[in-house]
């Protein structure tokens, strides 16, 4: 009996639940959802910049001679009207009158340092700045309404037969130079040919320079146009210095 009880107890121990243990529940593991791969970032297209049209190049004056030439001694060489120096003078002058900006003509205007060598007066630098250049600038602005911006230059007629050598002692000068009066600037505007004069060109070291455009002298600080005419006009007259 003792053995059977022991066996029975052993059987109960083998198959029975531990005292105090609650009912067991079998839970099947849940299937986990696999994470979706992150969508690849699509780069935004870079906007194409709007290209603005480049501004037209600004016009530029051209040199008649190196600036250093103004401080060198005068020469007796008679200038011509077919070389690059004269073509640059005309380029600068026409640019000045069609824009109304006299500064474009400064490389083509008789240099201040050369003027100081030429004139036998007390203060040639002051005279150049306050009379010679200022009057030329006024004359350029007076010509501007006649030609406008759209006029087309046809030719510049320089009466070489009137060119003279102005000797030292004449016209308050201490050294000489070549002078030619009454060149004609012939242009076309609106299909009509017109012209005006350049009162005086003078030389420095074999090149022509502008010096008086509208008049040699005036009674008031106003711009003057020299002999504006329909058609090509007539060069000259001779004289002056």
Protein language model annotation of sequence segments:
Residues 13-16:
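Bacterial signal peptide processing site
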Residues 1-3:
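N-terminal export and membrane-targeting signals
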Residues 107-127:
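Short, solvent-exposed secondary-structure junction/capping segments
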Residues 123-194, 241:
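Surface-exposed, charged secondary-structure patches
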Residues 47-95, 99, 107, 117:
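Short, low-complexity N-terminal intrinsically disordered segments enriched in polar/charged residues
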Residues 23-55:
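Extracellular mucin-like PTS domains
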Residues 19-25, 169-241:
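Low-complexity, intrinsically disordered terminal/linker segments enriched in charged
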Residues 8-11:
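C-terminal motif of bacterial Sec signal peptides marking the signal peptidase cleavage site
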